Amino acid sequence: MENIQLINIGFGNIVSANRVIAIVSPESAPIKRIITDARERGQLIDATYGRRTRAVIITDSSHVVLSAIQPETVAHRFVVNKETATINSN
Protein backbone atom coordinates (compact mmCIF):
# COMPACT_ATOMS: atom_id res chain seq x y z
CA MET A 1 0.00 0.00 0.00
CA GLU A 2 1.29 3.42 -0.94
CA ASN A 3 1.81 6.04 1.76
CA ILE A 4 -0.34 9.12 1.24
CA GLN A 5 1.62 12.30 1.85
CA LEU A 6 -0.25 15.57 2.25
CA ILE A 7 1.12 19.07 1.66
CA ASN A 8 -0.33 22.23 3.22
CA ILE A 9 -0.76 24.84 0.46
CA GLY A 10 -2.01 27.60 2.73
CA PHE A 11 -5.14 28.57 4.67
CA GLY A 12 -5.76 24.99 5.78
CA ASN A 13 -5.86 23.63 2.22
CA ILE A 14 -4.04 20.39 1.54
CA VAL A 15 -3.08 18.48 -1.62
CA SER A 16 -1.78 14.96 -2.03
CA ALA A 17 1.98 15.10 -2.65
CA ASN A 18 1.79 11.85 -4.61
CA ARG A 19 -0.42 13.51 -7.26
CA VAL A 20 1.66 16.68 -7.80
CA ILE A 21 3.49 16.95 -11.13
CA ALA A 22 4.68 20.58 -10.99
CA ILE A 23 4.71 23.66 -8.76
CA VAL A 24 5.20 26.77 -10.87
CA SER A 25 4.91 30.55 -10.78
CA PRO A 26 1.80 31.99 -12.49
CA GLU A 27 3.47 34.87 -14.37
CA SER A 28 4.32 33.27 -17.73
CA ALA A 29 1.90 33.20 -20.66
CA PRO A 30 1.90 29.37 -20.97
CA ILE A 31 0.95 28.97 -17.30
CA LYS A 32 -1.79 31.58 -17.66
CA ARG A 33 -3.07 29.55 -20.62
CA ILE A 34 -3.03 26.36 -18.52
CA ILE A 35 -5.07 28.16 -15.82
CA THR A 36 -7.61 29.41 -18.39
CA ASP A 37 -7.93 25.95 -19.98
CA ALA A 38 -8.42 24.30 -16.57
CA ARG A 39 -11.11 26.87 -15.67
CA GLU A 40 -12.96 26.08 -18.93
CA ARG A 41 -12.71 22.30 -18.27
CA GLY A 42 -13.93 22.73 -14.69
CA GLN A 43 -10.64 21.42 -13.29
CA LEU A 44 -9.40 24.61 -11.61
CA ILE A 45 -9.26 24.69 -7.82
CA ASP A 46 -8.78 28.17 -6.37
CA ALA A 47 -7.29 27.87 -2.88
CA THR A 48 -6.16 31.51 -2.65
CA TYR A 49 -9.06 32.80 -0.51
CA GLY A 50 -9.19 35.93 -2.67
CA ARG A 51 -5.50 36.69 -2.38
CA ARG A 52 -3.00 37.00 -5.21
CA THR A 53 -2.03 33.71 -6.87
CA ARG A 54 1.64 33.01 -6.22
CA ALA A 55 1.91 29.29 -7.00
CA VAL A 56 0.20 27.04 -9.52
CA ILE A 57 0.15 23.34 -8.69
CA ILE A 58 -0.46 20.92 -11.55
CA THR A 59 -1.60 17.39 -10.71
CA ASP A 60 -1.49 14.09 -12.58
CA SER A 61 -5.29 14.23 -12.99
CA SER A 62 -4.98 17.50 -14.99
CA HIS A 63 -6.38 19.52 -12.10
CA VAL A 64 -4.78 22.92 -11.54
CA VAL A 65 -4.63 24.28 -7.99
CA LEU A 66 -3.98 27.96 -7.30
CA SER A 67 -2.22 28.84 -4.04
CA ALA A 68 -1.44 32.17 -2.38
CA ILE A 69 1.95 31.03 -1.05
CA GLN A 70 5.24 31.14 -2.95
CA PRO A 71 6.23 28.14 -5.13
CA GLU A 72 9.48 27.86 -3.16
CA THR A 73 7.54 27.53 0.10
CA VAL A 74 5.29 24.82 -1.34
CA ALA A 75 8.33 23.00 -2.76
CA HIS A 76 10.12 23.22 0.60
CA ARG A 77 7.11 21.70 2.37
CA PHE A 78 7.05 19.01 -0.31
CA VAL A 79 10.72 18.11 0.27
CA VAL A 80 10.49 18.27 4.08
CA ASN A 81 7.36 16.12 4.05
CA LYS A 82 9.05 13.57 1.76
CA GLU A 83 12.14 13.40 4.01
CA THR A 84 9.94 12.93 7.09
CA ALA A 85 8.04 10.10 5.40
CA THR A 86 11.32 8.40 4.44
CA ILE A 87 12.63 8.63 8.00
CA ASN A 88 9.34 7.30 9.43
CA SER A 89 9.23 4.35 7.01
CA ASN A 90 12.72 3.18 8.04
Swiss-Prot record:
Signal peptide: none annotated. HAMAP family: RemA. Belongs to the RemA family. This is Putative regulatory protein cce_4590. It comes from Crocosphaera subtropica (strain ATCC 51142 / BH68) (Cyanothece sp. (strain ATCC 51142)).
